[in-house]
Amino acid sequence: MTARLIDGRQVAQQVHEEVRQAVERHTAQGRRAPGLAVVLVGENPASQVYVRNKRRTCEALGIESRSHDLPADTPQSVLLDLIDALNADPAVDGILVQLPLPAHFDTETVIERIDPAKDVDGFHPYNVGRLAVRLPTLRPCTPYGVMRLLDSTGEVYKGRNAVVVGASNIVGRPMALELMLAGATVTVCHRFTTDTAEHVARADIVVVAVGRPDLVPGEWIKPGATVIDVGMNRLEDGRLVGDVSFAAAAERAAWITPVPGGVGPMTVAMLMKNTIQSYESRLGR
């Protein structure tokens, strides 16, 4: 069996078009464009690339991107004051603080300072809690994007066994919630799990989000499974690879995401989707 690729770039373009059309519909009626404030603290090269991509996507879709670049030694109080100002700004519909922050910041304190209605990353505990009880919310972007990728396959995942490898607040835990709410039977493997291979071997859906190259060998994959590789790791030779041994896994899976070009584009696309959702909620329509 050779897996079919789930093309994240193609699905992301579909989401972009939905957002672009929504923005055009509103601005054609004389309304302001949606506004996204992007806050970058420090000069982490990877973060700079991610932020540049987000700002470029905003521009392409008609969303006004507001840049706030702060030096790495910025006191936490200054960042919190900036967030307060953005919370109060009626022209700002979404606030994104690029992670990771420098070591002297308390990340949870920063995230919780963002108005949940403007938390377009979907990281605020209020929004994750609403997701858990099936209430409308701004959903965490990467898991939200994964669900859109799964939908694109046309497969039915209700009642299937799903395994999430990784239990981070940003991906693993909300990913498990998304899959459970979609009707899958979900197992989460984390650093204390001793039999990850056995769990993966039984899974119809495998989502891996740890950040370790070749963490999941291809031979672990159940024939016919769907494999979503969230990991993005740069090797010494400059290549980007995921957490799954791609070539071997693709010989067994029915569907698989590539790295790059799989989940990555979807994270940015769903950020834009959340921004237009926040904007429309704030318009009251």
From Swiss-Prot:
Residues noted as binding NADP(+) in the record, renumbered to the chain: 166-168
Biological or metabolic pathway of the protein: One-carbon metabolism; tetrahydrofolate interconversion
GO BP annotation list: L-histidine biosynthetic process; methionine biosynthetic process; purine nucleotide biosynthetic process; tetrahydrofolate interconversion
Molecular-function annotations in GO: methenyltetrahydrofolate cyclohydrolase activity; methylenetetrahydrofolate dehydrogenase (NADP+) activity
GO cellular component, one term: cytosol
Catalytic activity, reaction form: (6R)-5,10-methylene-5,6,7,8-tetrahydrofolate + NADP(+) = (6R)-5,10-methenyltetrahydrofolate + NADPH; (6R)-5,10-methenyltetrahydrofolate + H2O = (6R)-10-formyltetrahydrofolate + H(+)
Protein task: Catalyzes the oxidation of 5,10-methylenetetrahydrofolate to 5,10-methenyltetrahydrofolate and then the hydrolysis of 5,10-methenyltetrahydrofolate to 10-formyltetrahydrofolate.
HAMAP family named among the record's database cross-references: THF_DHG_CYH
Protein family per UniProt: Belongs to the tetrahydrofolate dehydrogenase/cyclohydrolase family.
Protein name (Swiss-Prot/TrEMBL): Bifunctional protein FolD
Species this protein is from: Thioalkalivibrio sulfidiphilus (strain HL-EbGR7)
